[in-house]
Amino acid sequence: TKVVAPNRVVEHGQTFRFGQVTLRMHHYGTAHTPSDLCVEVLPDRVTYVGDVAMNNRIANMDDGSYVGTFKYYEALQQAAGDQLWVPGHGRPSRTLLRDYGEFMAGIYEPALKAVEDGQGVEVARANVLKDPRVARHARTMQGFDSNIGKYVSLAYLEAEKIAF
């Protein structure tokens, strides 16, 4: 196997045809990273979402945006419709964007409320851990225990940035 670096820019909405298969590129801004690209296999109603959504794993949000993720999911679902969503990690699912979006909202919304109420990140973390959208994943999600504090902190920082 020979690794070949990308040699052209891919644009949102661009399509590539390979025989009977057409691939459509989707980019709606920052979600997991600023350069998230999803690839829809048009005839099969399957979209590879990469790390934009994960199944039973917490995503690295260091360069991402919670609000951007929610907007990305909405735009992608509106453009692509009902799909089998294939994550970069975990099993494909028709409900992946909804399910992972609910989990991410369970982190972001309590952080936003803590910021709006003038409470610290510790309160946000406690409320995130009590949120049923998050709590139901605490025992089974890969990387949950070692990463949830960091992701609450990132959500809190993003909420603070938006509030100012």
Residue positions per predicted region:
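Accessory terminal helices/loops
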Residues: 78-80, 93-164
